[in-house]
Amino acid sequence: MIYRVKVSETAARQIREAADWWHGNRGGAVDALADDLERAFDLITRQPRIGKMADPPDPIYSRRIYLHRIHYFLYYSVDDRTETVEVLAFWHASRGSSPEFD
């Protein structure tokens, strides 16, 4: 079973901001961000429980996966009832803190 992807407004904004920066600063790997996001979305729709539970646990029980090549975390939640994964945040690992969710 393949789950649907829903992207929160916050995550969509964070992805747009990262993509804008990436295209302006990563000329040699301009497609890396888009490619890694596409792979991550495919992975979490096919294996929604693959991500580690975020630390500390938050009220929406988010999970996260690390995109090694681009050094970003993708935070998401799983709704088995609607067979949906909702992307909650796209957060660079160097920030050191956890993102705030909608």
Where do the PLM segments sit?
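Basic, Lys/Arg-enriched alpha-helical interface segments
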Residues: M1-S62, D80-T82, S98-D102
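Enriched for short, Lys/Arg-rich terminal
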Residues: L67-D102
